[in-house]
Design a protein with these regions (language model features):
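Generic structural signal for residues in well-ordered beta-strands
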Residues: 148, 224, 255, 346-348, ...
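Conserved AMP-binding/adenylate-forming
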Residues: 199, 208, 212-301
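AMP-binding/adenylate-forming catalytic core of the ANL superfamily
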Residues: 171, 275, 280-389
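Structured loop/turn residues at beta-strand edges in well-structured enzyme cores
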Residues: 13, 166, 196, 222, ...
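Conserved beta-strand termini and adjacent loop/short-helix elements that scaffold enzyme active sites
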Residues: 151, 227-229, 258, 351, ...
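Active-site phosphate/ATP/adenylate-binding loop shared across adenylate-forming ligases
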Residues: 48-219, 225, 233, 237, ...
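Nucleotide 5′-phosphate-binding alpha/beta core
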Residues: 1-113, 117, 355-364, 370-404, ...
């Protein structure tokens, strides 16, 4: 989705430019387009692109890089031209040219939309180890004009000491690590609001349910801004000061939101799967890449004046199941689970036992601390209020829940044991 929808001729021209570059420089896309029976010069409008250009899945990149290591046949540049390589789970290798921004221009815009001032100290706590997130944010804050504290993950007591000494006023990282910093501060005998100086927070990589947002904002006295992205795509969307949905970053991406059943573009108010094409990326361009993320498009314009469409992250294809006629989203369940500090990872197990009339869904919630006696009842009530379905609840040790069932993607959170 671009700032206008349907896309304007200028939007489509940029999209066709990106497709032509991929066809010319990437052996994978050149062969794939030929196999689909078209040349990019034959495409005239968005409808033709949607009808003829196949989607790219993460599995395509994994297979290509295994068959032709290290970068597969997607690479659209000579290896000697590369300036950096990042890694995404898979593992997948993400190369970048020296003059490719890697998402930093849109991140700088997002930082400005939060009200960050040049010269402020920004504390970046995403991982700098192999993954691209920490370095991307670091570069964006630095280029914006901030003093950057490269905290990374772990060593929370040391990070608190340094953040206090430097007077860090901007936090950037996951909401769960910010919560860990609050707990650590209290263990040190500090009051997070009094002894630390955070006033703004760039929350990313995990869901930010309203209950958790309120808890963290209350603990630190800061204002949190929700942002989303994907390692291969880069930044996708972020909140403005009105907190009325996340604005799409349309500078570097042509984003489509397609109905899960029909593949047709959804209208504002609808829910669809993200399909993204890089505009201008030359090392490893992705064409109609579908990471499996599902978004709801908001209706109307934002009062902040930014014309870019607004979205809310719903969940992932594969993390949404229909149970007794109700769509159950792993991300929706995650927001409820996040309200209970006793709980960590979870799974929703869906069954239709032989001889029983109705399907059954049970939440297996992993305990990370001792549970009060009324936890099961309170959790079941909140689930029904939010999911609009009665879910059974079973408390288990968190070690019994696989790691891929946790944030940020909840890939293993939905276990469907029905035989259809």
């Amino acid at each position: 989705m671009t700032p206008s929808w349907p896309p304007t001729p200028a939007d489509v021209a940029r999209l066709l430019e990106a497709l032509a570059l991929a066809e010319e420089r990437s052996p994978h896309y050149r062969a794939r387009f030929a196999a689909a029976g078209f040349r990019v010069t034959e495409l005239r409008d968005y409808d033709a692109v949607r009808a003829r250009v196949p989607r790219t899945a993460k599995a395509d990149l994994v297979a290509a890089q295994r068959a032709h290591p290290p970068f597969g046949d997607f690479l659209a540049a000579f290896p000697s031209e590369l300036a950096a390589v990042h890694v995404s789970p898979g593992p997948l290798y993400i190369p970048r040219l020296a003059d490719e921004p890697g998402g930093t221009p849109v991140l700088r815009e997002a930082i400005g939309a939060m009200g960050v001032r040049r010269g402020e100290v920004a504390h970046v706590t995403l991982s700098y180890h192999v993954m691209p997130g920490g370095l991307r944010l670091h570069r964006a804050f630095e280029e914006y004009g901030c003093v950057v504290l490269n905290g990374g993950t772990g060593a929370s007591a040391l990070q608190l000491q340094v953040a206090r000494d430097l007077g860090a006023t901007v936090y950037a990282g996951t909401p769960s690590f910010l919560g860990r910093l609050a707990d650590q501060a209290r263990e040190l005998g500090w009051d997070p609001r009094r002894d630390l100086h955070y006033r703004l927070g760039f929350s990313t990589a995990e869901a930010l349910p309203q209950v958790l947002r309120a808890e963290l904002e209350g603990a630190f006295g800061l204002e949190l801004f929700d942002h989303c992205g994907e390692a291969l795509i880069g930044p996708v969307a972020g909140e403005c000061r009105l907190h009325a949905g996340m604005h799409l970053h349309a500078r570097d991406l042509f984003c489509e939101f397609l109905d899960l059943a029909t593949g047709e573009p959804v209208e504002p108010g609808g829910t669809g799967e993200l399909v993204a094409t890089h505009l201008g990326r030359r090392a490893l361009p992705l064409v109609r890449y579908a990471p499996g993320d599902v978004y709801r498009l908001r209706v109307g314009d934002c009062g902040c004046g930014n014309p870019a469409p607004r979205v809310d992250f719903v969940g992932q294809v594969g993390t949404i199941r229909k149970v007794r006629g109700v769509l159950v989203h792993a991300a929706q369940v995650a927001r409820v689970v996040a309200e209970f500090p006793e709980l960590g990872r979870f799974q929703v197990v869906i069954e239709h036992p032989a001889g029983e009339r109705y399907e059954r869904a049970t939440l297996r919630a992993g305990l990370v601390r001792e549970a009060p006696t009324d936890l099961v009842g309170r959790l079941a009530r909140r689930l029904k209020e939010t999911v609009l379905l009665d879910l059974g609840v079973a408390l288990v040790a968190e070690a019994e829940i696989p790691e891929d069932a946790g944030p940020p993607r909840y890939a293993g959170a939905m276990v469907d044991r029905r035989t259809h």
